[in-house]
């Protein structure tokens, strides 16, 4: 029998797989998913709904995320440590870096998405302790 947390990790992997193919991941997201921007974001706070993800795509038309690790962080949470590349849609200035994400999954759908600017910050927010985090 596959554990719920393993199923959650697989669901989050399917989201990134869909995005990697430039396909929709809507089927994996709850209609009212919470998209949580950190306090230091240009627009901090919580957005609701699947369309929240479109804002990033519209701001950074070529925003690409390359997950490097998926971690089971409890009964509902999945941590994704990733690297990203993008360029501003208006300026064309290239941007690269690392991000971390915490996805909360319930009932076979992602219900909450939080992002962080570093792997270390993500691991701390998830309550995971790793000495090798960057």
Which residues does each predicted region cover?
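Short acidic-aromatic low-complexity motifs
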Residues: 2-31
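A solvent-exposed, acidic/Ser-Thr-rich amphipathic alpha-helical stretch
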Residues: 22, 26-76
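A beta-strand edge to alpha-helix "cap/lid" segment located at domain peripheries
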Residues: 1-13, 55-134
